[in-house]
């Protein structure tokens, strides 16, 4: 009887942890992070960013395509020196979101 209880608790913990991992994405399905639409003109800063970003090669929260003009779709970013929609800081640890640079099909995976 005791083994059944331990097994049931183990299965319950597994489902709780896997559900928390699925809900861990900081980017909403429509491409927003804390009310910031993740498209448009972006300025890279060294301190006090709107979003801290880590570049990864797998399992991103957002796929980003850099463009020169008209960054209208979610995941299309135009890097600028002024007139930005939001600011980012590239970090190696403790990011707000994880991004992957792509050449096509930007957006939320």
Predicted regions and their residues:
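Bacterial N-terminal signal peptides
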Residues: 8-19
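Bacterial N-terminal signal peptides that target proteins for export
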Residues: 1-8
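Repetitive, compositionally biased segments used for assembly/scaffolding
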Residues: 24-109
